[in-house]
């Protein structure tokens, strides 16, 4: 089990760090009182491998409870529980700027002087910083760069490469565009099997319908160009921190053309090793039914 304790200065990026760890599959708990760490660790280790990665945020928001941290760490060591400490740091100037921009009070500056609070916090955290396994100074880091630093330390390579989860979703425009769509492609310009008597009753999942849709030159040109676009977009979306991508393919009723094209795109992405799901939202809807869907 990997047991990570995330701590550091207020405003240094602990919230973003824990979100990045969560994206890497860590079970995360924010602001756990240090005195509860031993019992929490015991409970996690008793899951017999069901929970493999844990991350806890511990900071001075715990007030007097923070002073129990070292006693809890001592207990973990004595009981043979391995742990790591990640410390987030930043310069005084950057921290002051962040607090002013967020208009939040520093938890240790009741008098309103941010610098005094930062100074007090540095003193209280000096020992835990000295014991940290990893220290990340976020003064010059953008959110994406902090995420990359977290990935480099705590991510497994194959996990990082396949972190973007893609969903290819077919739908019918008559039932509304999916609200959670990232990319929407309209394939109503393609020849429609609905008007072919022997195909109307089938869906784009049936080979005879799929073969019909894919038999046209315009269809293949569209699919090739769409795949080229996705090959360009996907790594760049991931680079900018996107972890879920929903690609929506729409036709009139969501039963024939969009289904056939969505399946083709799904198979292409799957063959390239992407983590991809397929969903046909409106495939079973009555073709004459009205109304909206999410």
Swiss-Prot record:
Binding site for ATP: 8-15
Molecular function terms, GO-annotated: ATP binding; GTP binding
Keywords of the record: ATP-binding, GTP-binding, Nucleotide-binding
Pfam families, alphabetized: PapZ_C, RapZ-like_N
HAMAP family membership: RapZ_like
NCBIfam families for this protein: PRK05416.1 (NF003828)
Function of the molecule: Displays ATPase and GTPase activities.
Residues reported to bind GTP: 59-62
Family (UniProt): Belongs to the RapZ-like family.
Domain of life: Bacteria
Protein name, UniProt field: Nucleotide-binding protein CLJ_B3680
Keyword Transcription: no
